[in-house]
Amino acid sequence: MQRAFLMTCLMIFSSSVLASDQRQALWNRLEHATYIQTGSGKTVIYDFFDPNCLYCAKAFQLERPIADKGQLTVRCVPVGFLTDSSFDRAAAILQARNPREAMENNFMALLRTGHAVISSATATEATHSALRRNERIFIDTGATTLPELVYRLPGGQVKSFRGELSTEQLGLLISGHGLDS
């Protein structure tokens, strides 16, 4: 019994050490993900989104004014798995002449009507690979739902936040504080 307890403690301690290294590796992979950037602020967040996700649209609506003011850099990482049309809609956004505009228009319509408006598109081989790579990175965050934010604190610690973000939480993030998931 005592040995099992010690082994459990060792596994927990070891996984927390690995988790830090894994999170840094995750950040490095995110820097090479396919994303749509808004803003140019000092604080950088990676925001995974699905074109059919209402909560993702709400997160974008909250982040956009702060990004537009230059206080935040949001790297919107498309994934496509919530519904049958998600993957093809994510492909349509990435393959649009202006992906940022396509994403914004889709999110605004989703907020207004509750439905995504971007038409589905058949993914090119490059887009298909990019979306699958983004999905693998998303899975590696440990998340099972959207939105999922990944950010780095001023000291270099990589953290993630799952769920709907409040204005207050976004303010904390911009000021260099971590968030509780």
Q: Locations of the language-model features?
A:
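Positively charged n-region of N-terminal signal peptides that target proteins for export
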Residues: 1-4
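Extracytoplasmic thiol/disulfide redox context detector
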Residues: 6-85, 122-145, 163-181
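Conserved segment of the thioredoxin-like fold in thiol-based oxidoreductases
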Residues: 84-129
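Short acidic-hydrophobic, aromatic-tinged amphipathic segments that line or gate anion-handling sites
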Residues: 93, 161-162
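A short, hydrophobic beta-strand/beta-hairpin element that forms part of a small beta-sheet core
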Residues: 145-161
